[in-house]
């Protein structure tokens, strides 16, 4: 008798494009989005209002992949719930302030910085990380995320 063990993994990863992806939904809509790989934080409520965000990610991102970051904010005076507010992209397209060299392997983590200033004063915010790529064997990997809401 012979034995065989098989362990298969499939990462749901692709780069949806407006106009070519069927049923495309932009990541800036308040619900949904066409990318299947994303992480959304719980709403974060602040004691004092802020006007800027500074977010850092440690990520291993190969040349065939990308990480995009979106945010949404609301103030005490806003009658809308945070979940009803549309997402806004950091740097207009969700890209990092500056992109480090692509990672060579899954353990080659580099720091990505996303910052946005001159925002209307807000008392709550949420973040969305969208992972895209063309080769599902090499998805972006995120080790940790750090963020600060600033009143500048």
Please report, for each region that a protein language model flagged, where it lies by residue:
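Beta-strand-rich ligand- or partner-binding modules
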Residues: 1-152
């Amino acid at each position: 008798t012979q034995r065989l063990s098989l362990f298969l993994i499939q990462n749901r990863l692709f780069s949806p494009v407006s106009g070519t992806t069927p049923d495309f939904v932009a990541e800036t809509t308040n619900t949904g989005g066409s990318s299947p790989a994303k992480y959304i934080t719980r709403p974060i409520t602040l004691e004092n209002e802020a006007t800027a965000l500074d977010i850092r990610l440690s990520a291993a991102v190969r040349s065939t992949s990308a990480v995009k970051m979106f945010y949404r904010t609301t103030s005490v005076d806003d009658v809308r719930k945070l979940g009803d507010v549309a997402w806004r992209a950091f740097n207009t397209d969700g890209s990092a302030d500056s992109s480090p060299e692509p990672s060579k392997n899954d353990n080659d983590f580099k720091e990505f910085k996303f910052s946005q200033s001159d925002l209307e004063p807000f008392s709550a915010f949420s973040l969305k990380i969208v992972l895209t790529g063309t080769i599902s064997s090499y998805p972006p990997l995120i080790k940790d995320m750090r963020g600060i809401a600033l009143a500048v």
